[in-house]
Amino acid sequence: VAETVSKIKLANKPIPFPYRVHDQPDEDRLIPFVEFARKYGYHFQTKTPEQIANSFNEMLSKVQGLPEQRVLEQMGIRTMAKAIYTSKNIGHYGLGFEDYCHFTSPIRRYPDILVHRVLTSVLDGDPIVDKKMEQKCLHCSERERAAMETERASNKYKQVEFMKQFLGDEFDAVISGVASFGFWAETVDHKCEGFVSATSLLDYDDFIYYESEYALIGKRSNWAFRIGDPVKIKVISANLSKRQLDYEWILDLDFKPAQNKKKKK
């Protein structure tokens, strides 16, 4: 409430203000995701931003507790623009607010302080016109990204450190990412992500990356390694200095990779 009320105080005043904005989904990212979600039976209306938001909410509600929940949630997040701080208000698409800012939180951020200063000056009848507000917002956004990258690096380090004890062990996993040079898989038990190189798959087939399918597909076997697919992996390397986990795909006698549904041309 405080965050939206604070903006009302400034509604008709041309005062530089640190908004928290979130742009609409990028079409280039959205279309592949919509096609991917359709494979699981989820259909999107994309003519207007409101339809897109409603379709996302409907999917997120229906997918709860289903095997594809994690992959669709992760892929959905990746289609979204990143929220940033700026003095140029475009609204917050994700929250559905035309005007939004960060006022306070369990921790007090520097952007919160910027908001407090402007509001205090307005309430005191002597508004601050900070000509460097956009520069400060840019700095806040950059430091936020740096903090998130540091957090990811720290989490990855602890994952690698933890998985060192399991070298040579096999685990059930789920494919969490795919590229032309291999795929990433996250263990079901520990949520630790490692990489399976496409080179290590050459004994089985020559796999080609299909971006629209989010999949590596075998030339001869037509096997498909697709985001969200369950796999069996072996931990083969845990490099702390590089914060890197390497896995090897294990061909389970009771399991075969999914067959690609598209006919090969």
Describe each model-derived feature in a short phrase.
Residues F171, R220, K232:
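Eukaryotic intrinsically disordered and solvent-exposed regulatory patches
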